[in-house]
């Protein structure tokens, strides 16, 4: 009897010790990650820099009585003998809740009443997941309570998630998004140093994974959630990544941690690894201990994601902007408005405008994401989904972000405009880099058509008040006010450019929205407009109110646009210099049988549109026809030249390309940057305005 009791208590003690050990492991799961895993999940390269996070496991259910009879989930029922896609799961943070502590009878009863279905397979389904938080000595512990999930949504692609994390209750209503990526898919290029190519850089289009593997984009406007959701190709579970609100990020846990240990699984990081082993190359590598991998599996308990809380210091950054020319030039050109231009009927902005963004990822950003092209694509699509979400809050004008393409830099020399302006090891002079970027893009004609080019860097951005001053850090973004679609011909510089800093974890989303706002004509709240744009400015809106065009984004207003910003957008988008934003990136213009460009010269087309002449008569007109506007002094891109328009010696515009007559059309994406021209502008450094602190 005594022996039996002793055995019982000994067993209980062993179980308790095992539970506590697993709890501790769960609370510090990041300490068992390799450097590559840290970089993949948290975008940091040292365990001490990992932010606060929760381990999360997602579950999706539909009530059986509400499942449409035509839904394929019916074939996954218990009667069919097929295994459903997903299983009932729970959420943990800090502490681990052993399966033995669950109410088995409640689990069995719930399993009888509900049925797992494929959230991606049913666009009409409504999904609800409830996360509840309770305290433990290891931190907050979250458990999942199953709720009734129905297919009551009447709108395709709407899914609901109820969750409580970091003391906040969130009810996400996620709607599937279209339009950020073009119908023919997202184009991605890699940029490499090559002295034989123009500007010493070679651009090569990359073949990436199909859209099904890539996933679908979802947004919740009210809660500021922008997510990319896909199915894992092996086990079929949902993989979710993106941003929630201004400080939460959800990321998947690497497969190397969620998969059982394999004999051929090798790691270079020495933390929690076995002794070094040798392979044929003679180089030492490290292998994670099987016992360690098993403990990770037990601690994760099937969790596939982490919710990360960003440091507020990473959210609130200063922003700078530059004016495009001195004030007196803008006034003079407004006085020169000709009677012909004044009487010409103005083209009003459409109900929806589509800024097409060319995303340029520098080499440090490439390394930040582990050099994984697929992950880089997913991250930055999720990133711009978050930026687009901020513009979705505008009810008028309606602005829909579209990605023209992504360029991934495979070396520092692939972005020479950044490299030439390095300050020390980890910073760049933002004003000088922006100027050089504009000049580089003016000469570069191998890139896809775009309205705005944005370089994204992990490097710290700094500013000099004067040429030889110290470069003061703290800036996170830099752009020209009203620069969208604009080129300075005298200085040979594109003004439709911006540089933003992003250190991972979607820290640069609001900064990107802010800088694109500058390019679309908005100034900082509390500031007057530049004279060359005119309009309402933002003097009536206080900087301290903390809207997007302020740097004091400490409340929910940091997701919204001030009334002054909205008025500035209206003014800019209805001006003569914004017409390149009017075309939809998804228009499918079929080739007409009679080519109108053979009937009207480029000058004749401009006379009909602007009453003036064409600014350029080379291959650029196939992407955008620039016509001189006497009223503003700019060359304005109204639309592409008509099909069949001449674009060089014996060459004509066909499907947006300048080709020799009867030549086969082979896509090479060599169209020139959409741009405007304004003569007699002054050098950039004479017109820099800093943000308010």
Swiss-Prot record:
Ranges of compositional bias, category Polar residues: 67-80
Cofactor(s) of this protein: Zn(2+)
Region ranges (Disordered): 67-91
Active site: residue positions: 515
Keyword list, A-Z: Disulfide bond, Extracellular matrix, Glycoprotein, Hydrolase, Metal-binding, Metalloprotease, Protease, Secreted, Signal, Zinc
Coiled coil: none
Classification via InterPro entries: ADAMTS_CR_2 (IPR041645), MetalloPept_cat_dom_sf (IPR024079), Peptidase_M12B (IPR001590), ZnMc_salivary_gland_MPs (IPR034030)
Family matches, as Pfam families: ADAMTS_CR_2 (PF17771), Reprolysin_3 (PF13582)
Induction: Expression is induced in epidermis during the 4th ecdysis, pupal ecdysis, pupal stage and eclosion. Induced by 20-hydroxyecdysone in the cultured wing imaginal disks, but not in fat bodies, of day 5 fifth larval instar.
Leader peptide range in chain numbering: 1-24
EC number: 3.4.24.-
GO CC terms, sorted: extracellular region
Main location per the UniProt record: secreted
Glycosylation sites: 124, 194, 687
Gene Ontology BP annotations: instar larval development; membrane protein ectodomain proteolysis; metamorphosis; molting cycle process; pupation
Binding positions (Zn(2+)): 514, 518, 524
Sample GO molecular function, one term: zinc ion binding
Residues in Peptidase M12B domain copies: 353-585
UniProt subcellular location: Secreted, Extracellular space, Extracellular matrix
Motif Metal-binding positions after renumbering to this chain: 514-525
PROSITE patterns per UniProt: ADAM_MEPRO, ZINC_PROTEASE
Cofactor-binding details, from the entry: Binds 1 zinc ion per subunit.
Disulfide bonds: 485-580, 541-564
Its biological purpose: Involved in larval molting and metamorphosis. May degrade extracellular matrix (ECM) and basement membrane (BM) during the development of organs to allow degeneration and remodeling of tissues.
Descriptive protein name: A disintegrin and metalloproteinase with thrombospondin motifs like
Originating organism: Bombyx mori
């Amino acid at each position: 009897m005594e022996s039996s009791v002793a055995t019982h208590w000994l067993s209980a003690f062993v179980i308790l010790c095992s539970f506590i050990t697993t709890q501790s492991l769960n609370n510090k799961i990041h300490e068992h990650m390799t450097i590559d895993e840290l970089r993949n999940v948290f975008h940091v390269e040292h365990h001490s820099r990992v932010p606060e996070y929760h381990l999360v496991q997602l579950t999706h259910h539909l009530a059986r009585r509400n499942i449409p009879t035509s839904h394929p989930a019916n074939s996954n029922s218990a009667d069919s003998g097929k295994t459903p896609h997903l299983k009932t799961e729970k959420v943990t943070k800090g502490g681990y809740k052993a399966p033995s502590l669950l109410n088995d009878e409640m689990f069995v009863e719930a399993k009888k009443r509900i049925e797992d279905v494929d959230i991606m397979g049913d666009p009409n389904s409504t999904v609800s997941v409830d996360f509840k938080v309770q305290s433990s000595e290891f931190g907050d512990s979250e458990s999942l309570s199953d709720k009734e999930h129905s297919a009551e949504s009447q709108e395709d692609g709407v899914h609901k998630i109820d969750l409580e994390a970091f003391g906040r209750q969130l009810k996400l209503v996620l709607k599937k998004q279209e339009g950020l990526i073009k119908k023919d898919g997202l184009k991605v290029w890699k940029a490499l140093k090559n002295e034989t190519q123009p500007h010493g850089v070679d651009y090569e289009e990359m073949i990436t994974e199909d859209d099904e593997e890539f996933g679908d984009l979802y947004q919740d406007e009210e809660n500021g959630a922008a997510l990319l959701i896909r199915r894992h190709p092996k086990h079929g579970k949902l993989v979710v990544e993106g941003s929630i609100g201004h400080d939460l990020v959800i990321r998947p846990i690497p497969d190397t941690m969620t998969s059982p240990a394999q004999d051929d699984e090798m790691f270079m990081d020495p933390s929690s690894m076995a002794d070094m082993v040798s392979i044929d190359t003679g180089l030492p590598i490290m292998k994670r201990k099987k016992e360690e991998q098993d403990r990770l599996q037990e601690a994760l308990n099937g969790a596939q994601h982490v919710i990360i809380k960003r440091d507020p210091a990473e959210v609130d950054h200063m922003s700078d902007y530059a004016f495009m020319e001195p004030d007196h030039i803008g006034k003079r050109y407004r006085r020169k408005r000709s009677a012909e231009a004044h009487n010409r009927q103005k083209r009003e902005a459409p109900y929806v405008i589509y800024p097409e963004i060319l995303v340029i990822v520098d080499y440090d950003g490439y390394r930040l994401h582990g050099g994984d092209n697929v992950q880089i694509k997913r991250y930055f699509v999720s990133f711009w989904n978050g930026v687009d979400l901020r513009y979705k809050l505008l009810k008028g004008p309606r602005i829909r972000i579209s990605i023209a393409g992504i360029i991934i830099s495979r070396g520092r020399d692939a972005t020479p405009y950044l490299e030439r302006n390095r300050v020390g090891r980890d910073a760049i002079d933002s004003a000088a880099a922006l100027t050089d970027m504009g000049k580089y893009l003016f000469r570069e004609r191998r890139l896809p058509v775009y309205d705005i080019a944005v370089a994204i860097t992990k490097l710290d951005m700094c500013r000099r008040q004067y040429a030889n001053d110290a470069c003061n850090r703290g800036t996170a973004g830099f752009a020209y006010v009203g620069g969208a679609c604009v080129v300075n011909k005298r200085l040979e510089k594109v003004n439709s450019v911006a540089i933003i800093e992003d250190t991972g974890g979607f820290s640069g989303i609001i900064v990107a929205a802010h800088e694109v706002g500058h390019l679309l004509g908005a100034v900082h709240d509390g500031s007057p407009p530049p004279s060359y744009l005119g309009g309402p400015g933002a003097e009536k809106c206080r900087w301290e109110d903390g809207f997007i065009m302020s740097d004091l984004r400490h409340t929910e207003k940091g997701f919204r646009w001030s009334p002054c910003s909205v008025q500035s957008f209206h003014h800019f988008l209805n001006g003569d210099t914004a017409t390149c934003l009017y075309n939809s990136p998804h228009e499918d213009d079929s080739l007409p049988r009679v080519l109108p460009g053979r009937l009207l010269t480029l000058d004749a087309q401009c006379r009909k549109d602007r009453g003036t002449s064409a600014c350029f008569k080379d291959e650029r007109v196939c992407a955008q026809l620039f016509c001189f506007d006497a009223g503003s002094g700019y060359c304005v891109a109204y639309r592409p030249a008509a099909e069949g328009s001449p674009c060089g010696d014996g060459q004509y515009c066909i499907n947006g390309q300048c080709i020799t007559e009867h030549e086969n059309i082979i896509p090479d994406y060599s169209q020139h940057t959409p741009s405007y021209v304004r003569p007699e502008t002054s050098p950039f450094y004479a017109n820099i305005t800093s943000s308010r602190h």
